[in-house]
Amino acid sequence: MAKTIKVTQIRSSIGRLPKHKATLVGLGLRRIGHTVEREDTPAIRGMINLVSYMVKVEE
């Protein structure tokens, strides 16, 4: 089984760059406090790095 990570949105996407909003949607995050579990892949890590100021990551 692949390793997973928990990603939680901690800041609003209002007023952010459209690319950053799209990245949150790609991660499956919809609102502040929403948590999703994603596979730990380089693609997901890249998405998290792009919006690192809006999300919290738990290994």
From Swiss-Prot:
Pfam families: Ribosomal_L30. One of its GO terms (cellular component) is cytosolic large ribosomal subunit. GO terms for molecular function: structural constituent of ribosome. PROSITE patterns: RIBOSOMAL_L30. SUPFAM superfamilies: Ribosomal protein L30p/L7e. Keywords: Ribonucleoprotein, Ribosomal protein. GO terms for biological process: translation. Belongs to the universal ribosomal protein uL30 family. HAMAP family: Ribosomal_uL30_B. Part of the 50S ribosomal subunit. This is Large ribosomal subunit protein uL30. It comes from Photorhabdus laumondii subsp. laumondii (strain DSM 15139 / CIP 105565 / TT01). The gene is rpmD.
